[in-house]
Amino acid sequence: MGSQTLQILRQGVWASVTGGWYYDPDQNTFVNALHLYIWLFLLCFPFTLYMALQPSMVIVGIYCGVIAAMFLLLKTVNYRLHHALDEGEVVEHQTRESKGSRGGTGGANDPVTRREDSNGLGDPGGGIEMADFIRQETPPVDCSSRNSYVGMDLNQRMSSTHGRTTVAKAPGSEETVIFRRERSTFRRQAVRRRHNAGSNPTPPTSLIGSPLRYALHEADRPSGVRSWYRTVKSQPSRTPSQVTVLSTSASLLARNGSTHLEGSQDKASTVGTTSLQDEFGTLTPSLYEIRGCHIGLGNFESATRRASNNIWDTDSHLSSSTSVRFYPHDLISLHHIRANRLLTMDPELLEQQDDLSPDLQDAPLGQDNPSAASAAGKTRQYYRLWLLPFLWVGLHFDRLTLLALFDRNREVLENVLAVVLAVLVAFLGSVLLIHGFFADIWVFQFCLVIASCQYSLLKSVQPDSSSPRHGHNRIIAYSRPVYFCLCCGLIWLLHYGSLRTTSSRFTLYGVALTSSLVLASARDLVIVFTLCFPIIFFVGLLPQVNTFVMYLFEQLDIHVFGGNASTSLLSALYSILRSIVTVALLYCFCYGALKENWEPHHIPVLFSVFCGLLVAVSYHLSRQSSDPSVLMYVPLSKVFPQLRSKNPEDPLSEVQDPLPEKLRASVNERLQSDLIVCVVIAVLYFAIHVSTVFIALQPYLSYVLYGLLGAVGLLTHYLLPQLRKQLPWYCFSHPLLKTKEYYQFEVRDAAHVMWFEKFHVWLLFVEKNVLYPLVILNELSGSARELASPKRLDTEVGALMITVAGLKLLRSSYSSPTYQYITILFTVLFFTLDHRHLSETLLLDLFLMSIIFSKMWELFYKLHFVYTYIAPWQITWGSAFHAFAQPFAVPHSAMLFVQAVVSSIFSTPLNPFLGSAIFITSYVRPVKFWERDYNTKRVDHSNTRLASQLDRNPGSDDNNLNSIFYEHLTRSLQHSLCGDLLLGRWGNFSTGDCFILASDYLNALVHLIEIGNGLVTFQLRGLEFRGTYCQQREVEAITEGVEEDEGCCCCEPGHLPHILSFNAAFGQRWLAWEVVVTKYVLEGYSITDNSAASMLQVFELRRILTTYYVKGIIYYVIASPKLEEWLANDTMKEGLRGCSERNYVDLDATFNPNIDEDYDHRLSGISRDSFCGVYLGWIQYCNSRRTKPLDSEKDSALVLLCFGLCVLGRRALGTAAHQMSSNLESFLYGLHALFKGDFRISSVRDEWIFADMELLRKVVVPGIRMSLKLHQDHFTSPDEYDEPAVLFEAISTHQQNLVIAHEGDPAWRSAVLSNAPSLLALRHVLDEGTNEYKIIMLNRRYLSFRVIKVNKECVRGLWAGQQQELVFLRNRNPERGSIQNAKQALRNMINSSCDQPIGYPIYVSPLTTSYCNSHPQLRHILGGPISFGNIRNFVVSTWHRLRKGCGAGCNSGGNIEDSDAGGLSCGTSQSSQSVQSGLVRHSPARASVVSQSSSYRYSSSRHSSLRTSTTGLEPCRRSSTSQLSLRTLPTSLQLRLGSTSDPAGPSSSLSSHSIPPCKRHTLVGLLGNDGLCSTVTDPLSQHHHPHHHPQQHNPTHATVRRDDISYRVQIVDVGQVLENINLSKRKELQWPDDAMRHKAGRTCWRDWSPLEGMEGHVIHRWVPCSRDPGSRSHIDKTILLVQVEDKIVPIIETGVIELGAEV
């Protein structure tokens, strides 16, 4: 603890004051001395110039020139040295030892130059390369001549290829020199310091060191060239460390799956063994040696695997968060750490260079291995640094020493920027010095500031107090000089402005903005701020530059232009530019209007045009996202459709994600709607404004508008939300306005739209689109003339203020109207009744007060957070420091209030220091808060190597597997969040609000970032399912009810009915969160996990599973369309020939009499006879269900193939279980291996399967997966699957409705995100060293969540505190006090939701935008977007309704059916039978007419009320005989030309003779005699085909009844819908066909739900006690099948009303 404190004081506090300089005891004297001299020079040089010379530009010139030369030299040398270490030639000097003295000519060992190309271990993390691991050969640099030498390239003319040797030996030299060319590819990677991390799915593409790469090249060369390498290898120049690095890199290459090793594994293994000879001639095993420490590779792997499941487990973008990634000093040595750091790199953290702690960088050399030390003494490395083409300098240097000296600038542009900033700092600082802005001691202080800014460009503070991430942050180095230049420039501008004397003075609210006194005071304030830079940067009040720019643009866009929050630096820049361009365009209209002559009772027309455009443009901007990529995606996808094509090499290329297309459609719809609506709005408000209503009706119009606005705002944003809260006004114990789901124990349907929700939507619509525009236009009309007068702001400035203020107020009103009514009412009352003399026109008053009120709300939230956090009666001390800090915080309450005010002005978080009661202000942040675009990447088979999947099972921890549910929850929220917010289901909301969604197992924090008009951009952070103890306590706090609390102080007198007790009401007021709603309905997955061990514990249960496994294989092989091809395959026939013998018995030890049902005890194995005795009946039944049944006798090829496959499948299961199927653990291991597709074909008898791998993929794998589901069903109904028909139907149903896959399979993720109704998986979790197998069952349904609104300042403060504590203060204690539970602030849950590695969420979503037009209920209330397609559909629908109405009006009362069919009624259900079934299926002419007519109707009236049923037949229409046409022909045909199959029915005599002659003449004219005759005479041909027809699965050809399609109905009660009736296994209802059954229910509807008011055709009905089984209802109510669009809805008859027959 003491050493850590000293390190923080040294590297944090002192380095922040000096700009980066501090004494580092872990570095050598040269490094520390050089740092000190540079810093003293930067400090004393300007001070000396100022004191020695007269203040003039000479000082500026000298100072800038020296600084430019110095930085140019240092940056150039630094860059060149890094370049030399990257691509320079390594020069190895081997000294020869002869009895303790150095001498001799050294003729035995000739120096050799090698050139290698290595893309390997160059500089992982910005400064660790292969040479860093043998640093005993490169002692620290000093200034003696021993460390460098100058030589001439004597071999410059010789080719430097791999096969050439180059000799460069000086006469009489005592040393042998080997030049090695190393070129390394540097990755910007860093080792993440954290206490929990995930698994990296994407290891670096190449981590092969130079020796190994060379060895692999050598392995592919001819023997003549290879002999050269043996010569070099045999020399003692190759130290054990180098040999060991070679072998270890070979093992790394093997694990990394690189192409070099895959091509020649035998050669690589030769390199890894025969090449490992040291100078003693011994064969060195695979060792990893660092600084003389030999580490066996096997031990190394075990050590790293104890710390992580995967050697690449450091990517901070992963959901896994439970593994520990620290390497403490007492558990693992420095050498292990460096080896692990080499192998664990994070390719995403581009801002980091080297994360190696200073106390680890130069640890003393261990003397564990004398031989290594002696080898180190004999070999010294140099690097060639070329000065001229033939002149080079040999540098005795290494990477770590160079990085300890100066920060590395990787690009030339970075070096140029650093030099320019250093010179700019010198120029601006010296100019301020010579002009006398500083005097006395402040000159030295200013020189200290200059030195700190310049020194940070050489060696920056790492980590800085405002750094958002661990490790080296490249951007933070530029923060100080950039801020210094900004402040100096601002000082000069203010000073110049204060010296200018001008007659035009602008005053606002009594303040002269152009007064020299005001400008001089502001200049002095900036000067003081600049002098305080050391303290400011130490405290961390200024962020890194990119964060500051994003924050500044966002604040300007929100408070000046009325924009929304930004999602990135690019979006902030885009938003501010968009606002500036808009203001510039509108300014032209406003300026032109103000230049015209204004009459007292007349407004210029141009100003009315300006007002109309202002409202329209504000409406459009409020509906657009700040992210330009969303807007650009639509035109780019049209112009360049190839951009949307997938990469064929992408493993997920086959997975179709519907979300991007939905988003594109939503954005496209919104753009079309805006195009139309903006034109309408502009014209409408222009017409209103030009009518002079805003002048003629004054002042009464203003009073009416303010009164309406106040009443509507109070009702919409205060009364209704309070009445709907869980605890209204913290007095009532339940909501006063309850939803339909409030008392439901389990929600089964989508949330019902209540009347008050519709009322809220319409009030919000009127408020945003009518009241606010009218109020603001009213103020524009009354204030414009006065603002533009010379007494105020004059025309130019007045026009600008009018444009900016109007745009800001209108955009804010459209985007977030929650608190606008309070601002407007307060402003009107304050400036018209209380202080009229202070008013600067109500327009500017509103503009100013809107900014002040936003800051006041922020101050209110901050104070509320502070008070609830430090309240003495509920403070929870997480550590001893908290108890110590609590009393010391009391005397500083006044300072705390000042901090709260200042932090509210600048929108900075107020965070508790180390989680205690002491609060400090953090640096400014945008609304998004987190500076990194962090989002979780799930580990699955698409981003891990195959070897990892088979061996280590990456991503098998619960957190990684459970993250998919939060991803699905994000998708659900994307569809419904914006609409639910507008319906008021989450209460009041504003930008930056935070909510917690809590259910049984899902706990997610939802951060609302950007809120626009009809759009919300949010981020979801999912917490662990089974969190820590502290998380569980806080989850209990937000889920427990307080209604039953009866306490009052210290007694329990009870409470009034429906009223909270005193203690409960008091406690709820002292929380930083509140429960908004307890039953928020959202579609998700209910998760059921059963222990596989308990379900397979007994041999009998394993026997059942194996039986289902075999039957599943048989089902899939017979159902496969490739069965005949397999039976004819010669390779398979040859492989199965042995099995075809009569006396063949498979005696494999895998088979077990306790598990295999067909085990033959007499033969001690499985024979064909025993197999057929059990499974032949099942084979024959499956074969009978084929379209073309095959021979399935006992000796047939089909049975032989089934036998071979079943034996192979069980043998694969035994192989995966290591031949120990009797052992439960081994059986589960094998079952899981087969479930994920890991089949190991180990027997020669099974190699025939390789003839077609589709047998494994399409037969055996589905068989093992389906057996798991059938095994689960066995527990609910043990004997149900004994019948082959039931089992066959069950497998078919599961195959259609159930997704069974491994959770690592990309298909699993695709199914979840595609809203598959049910999923099943077998999960293997390694939890604390124990293997646990779970059967996971997911069922999609509606979930109930509690919505908790958290004080957003509480969330921002706790997040900022965690970031500072872990990054700057380096507190890595996993049980630190700041994450202990605090129920009043939900401290643990909020801190757990931070970005990894600061927090440990299992899922962090990308920034996701939800649009209101994707919410079906909101579309039903307000109507969809006014797009061109919707307008066309509306016109077509209206036209068809008019035609229907006109047809009904012109009807003479007669009825086609009544007159032509002997009074046959459309309503007869019992008597009439299916009169057109054969007609539909087997009449060619009839079928053609039906298809043409139905397709015509469907295309023409798809969106109209005249829906076409799925039968393809038009419902019967009541129309006059004169209206018979092609459009109504199919109905007439089906009603009159059919014949019944039931002779007992009253309609059995129906024939063509019932058609009148006039109608028959019409039909003949339309169809011809052949068509009509075939239609009439071919009704019974359906009986000629008794076998199953594939057409029966097509609803178009389904058999429907005449009475089932005779009328339309409207749904009036969705509670009568039977959405799960098609899933019943007991077959209560006889459906018309199976395809119709699959389409009639929630499993087919997916995101669609029937709503009240929907209309459709009745296509089938079940009546109680019907004679016909196909029409018999299993309950005492009539059930209808209603066709609504393309969906089929089963509903009880009482839930609809009949609309009558269609006309």
From Swiss-Prot:
Gene: pcnx1
Compartments reported by the entry: Membrane
Protein keywords: Glycoprotein, Membrane, Transmembrane, Transmembrane helix
GO cellular component, one term: membrane
Residues linked to a glycan: N256, N564, N988, N1129, N1391, N1622
Name of a matching Pfam family: Pecanex_C
UniProt similarity note: Belongs to the pecanex family.
Biased composition (Basic residues): 1582-1591
Region described as Disordered: 91-126, 1475-1556, 1577-1598
Stretches with biased composition (Low complexity): 1485-1510, 1518-1556
Lineage, broadest ranks: Eukaryota, Metazoa, Chordata, Craniata, Vertebrata
Transmembrane intervals: 31-53, 57-74, 416-438, 477-499, 525-547, 569-591, 603-622, 675-697, 704-721
Keyword Isomerase: no
Membrane topology qualifier: Multi-pass membrane protein
Basic and acidic residues composition bias: residue spans: 91-100
Natural source organism: Takifugu rubripes
Protein name as annotated: Pecanex-like protein 1
